[in-house]
Amino acid sequence: MSDEITNGAAKPTEAISGPTFTIEKIYIKDVSFEAPNSPAVFNEAGQPELQLNLNQRVQRLNENAFELVLHVTLTCTAAGKTAYVVEVQQAGVFGLFGLDQHAIGVLLGTQCPNILFPYVRSLVSDLIQIGGFPPFYLQPINFDALYAETLRQRAQNEKEGSQISSQPAGNA
C-alpha cells in the first residue's frame, strides 16, 4: 500500500499508451464588459440589435500540447447607441498524444471548442446580467459544421490558387 496522494490529474506522458485526448487546463485568457451609454441606455425603447462574432485560435505549445482560445464578442445596440460590448477569450490546454494530423485537426476544430463553449456562454450571460441588462443566452453552436465549412473553404481557396498559378502571367 502506498501513502502517495494523487489529485486526479493525468499521468505523465511516459505512462500514456495509444491515442489519448486530455484536458490539461481551462482558463479565462481575457474578459471585458463595457456599457458606454449607461445609465441612459436603460431607458431606450425598441428592440435591441445583437451582433455576435466568434473565432478561435490554436497555438502548439509542444509536441503534444495545444492551446485553443475561443474568442467571442457580443455587441448590443439600442436606438443606434451601444448598450454593451462583451468580449471573452476562454482558453484551454489540451493534450493530444499518438494522433495523426487529421485527427488532431478534427479534435482542435470540433471537440475542444465544444468543451470551452459552455464556459463562454456562462461568462457572457453573467457579465450581461451583472451589467444591469436582461439575460442573454448564447445558443448552441455546431462546431462540427463550422469545421467542415472551414475545410471546404480551404480546399476551394487551394483550388483557386492552383488555377491562378497555372495560368500564364503577363504578356507571354
Curated annotation (Swiss-Prot):
UniProt GO cellular component terms: cytoplasm
Annotated Gene3D superfamilies: SecB-like
InterPro entries named in the record: SecB (IPR003708), SecB-like_sf (IPR035958)
Subcellular location: Cytoplasm
Record flagged with keyword Nucleotide-binding: no
Superkingdom of origin: Bacteria
GO biological process: protein folding; protein tetramerization; protein transport
Gene Ontology terms, MF aspect: unfolded protein binding
Transmembrane segment boundaries: none
Keywords carried by this UniProt record: Chaperone, Cytoplasm, Protein transport, Translocation, Transport
HAMAP family, per the entry: SecB
NCBIfam families per record: PRK05751.1-2 (NF004391), PRK05751.1-4 (NF004393), secB (TIGR00809)
Main function: One of the proteins required for the normal export of preproteins out of the cell cytoplasm. It is a molecular chaperone that binds to a subset of precursor proteins, maintaining them in a translocation-competent state. It also specifically binds to its receptor SecA.
Subunit structure, interactors included: Homotetramer, a dimer of dimers. One homotetramer interacts with 1 SecA dimer.
Family the UniProt entry places it in: Belongs to the SecB family.
Protein name: Protein-export protein SecB
Lineage: Bacteria, Pseudomonadati, Pseudomonadota, Gammaproteobacteria, Lysobacterales
Gene from which the chain derives: secB
